[in-house]
């Protein structure tokens, strides 16, 4: 038995297909979903959704949102999403490195708003790099 998975942003459907398994970046940690999972509603962090439609895993960078699981259907509503296969790994790594520098600078500045904005940009860049197949040491 498989899961019906839909990943939806405000302007497009990023994924609409069957999957054997899905791993979500919930606000309480990584959450694995298989068919027959109990009904669930969870908030999602900025991170990487991992979907296994067959033998291989697909990655999708998501920019926070919510996921609902019910009757082998997984509906994921996110602010933004990008398939890992469409992200250039070198560009994503460069963006992540630049975001890390901006975060370090913002941390030293003492400006709380600047720190929060830099941290959000860093999380988005990290998610894109991880989804592209890059390894990020935390």
From Swiss-Prot:
It holds the Pfam family ATP-synt_DE. Residues 89-114 have a biased composition (Basic and acidic residues). Residues 89-117 are annotated as: Disordered. GO terms for molecular function: ATP binding; proton-transporting ATP synthase activity, rotational mechanism. Gene3D superfamilies: F0F1 ATP synthase delta/epsilon subunit, N-terminal (2.60.15.10), Helix hairpin bin (1.10.287.540). Keywords: ATP synthesis, CF(1), Hydrogen ion transport, Ion transport, Membrane, Thylakoid, Transport. The keyword Cell wall biogenesis/degradation does not apply. InterPro entries: ATP_synth_F1_dsu/esu, ATP_synth_F1_dsu/esu_N, ATP_synth_F1_esu_C, ATPsynth_dsu/esu_N. It is a peripheral membrane protein. The keyword Hydrolase does not apply. One of its GO terms (cellular component) is proton-transporting ATP synthase complex. It is found in: Cellular thylakoid membrane. It comes from the Bacteria. Belongs to the ATPase epsilon chain family. F-type ATPases have 2 components, CF(1) - the catalytic core - and CF(0) - the membrane proton channel. CF(1) has five subunits: alpha(3), beta(3), gamma(1), delta(1), epsilon(1). CF(0) has three main subunits: a, b and c. Produces ATP from ADP in the presence of a proton gradient across the membrane. This is ATP synthase epsilon chain. It comes from Gloeothece citriformis (strain PCC 7424).
